[in-house]
Amino acid sequence: TVATILTILASTCMARNVLVNNEGLYAGQSLVVEQYTFIMQDDCNLVLYEYSTPIWASNTGVTGKNGCRAVMQADGNFVVYDVKGRAVWASNSRRGNGNYILVLQKDRNVVIYGSDIWSTGTYRKKVGGTVVMAMNGTVDGGSVVGPVTVNQNVTAVRKVAAAA
């Protein structure tokens, strides 16, 4: 397979598809990549859409409860909190404090990396995916082009071509 190394760019002019430690989505905010949207809806339901079709949901929707948030925690757990700050859903991926990144991938999957510890399970076969690694400035022995520093660790994103 042919792999192209990409960097994560946090830019207001680009749609984001990643959350790092302590970043989150509030009501109406989303991660977007191509036709996929991972959104914290106003009703407190966290939903992954392909175009306008829901693919996965946290099933935490409560009518009229604007004020929820989904947070990628520094312990590796991704948690939806209600308006009162109570956890109403979690990925159950807690691994202890470290550097984690949640990625909405082009293969329709949402994955938490530090190690591959949680995903929505919506991976689509024969579609290129995204692999995130942090290895002291290298990705599988290759050089990292324009790495991004996340909590003092170098993080790179590698786009993997689809298998034929």
Swiss-Prot record:
What is the name attached to this protein's record? Lectin
Q: By its UniProt entry, which InterPro entries does this protein fall under?
A: Bulb-type_lectin_dom, Bulb-type_lectin_dom_sf
The protein's superkingdom reads Eukaryota
Q: Output the PTM entry.
A: Not glycosylated.
Recall the taxonomic lineage recorded for the source organism.
Eukaryota, Viridiplantae, Streptophyta, Embryophyta, Tracheophyta
Source organism (scientific name) = Allium cepa (Onion)
Show the SUPFAM superfamilies listed in the entry: alpha-D-mannose-specific plant lectins
Cite the record's note on assembly. Answer: Homotetramer.
Cystine crosslinks? 44-68
Keyword Signal belongs to the record: yes
Where does the signal sequence lie? 1-15
Mind telling me which residue stretches traverse the membrane in this protein?
none
Q: Which GO terms describe its biological process?
A: response to other organism
Q: Does the keyword Signal apply?
A: yes
Keyword set, alphabetical order: Disulfide bond, Hemagglutinin, Lectin, Signal
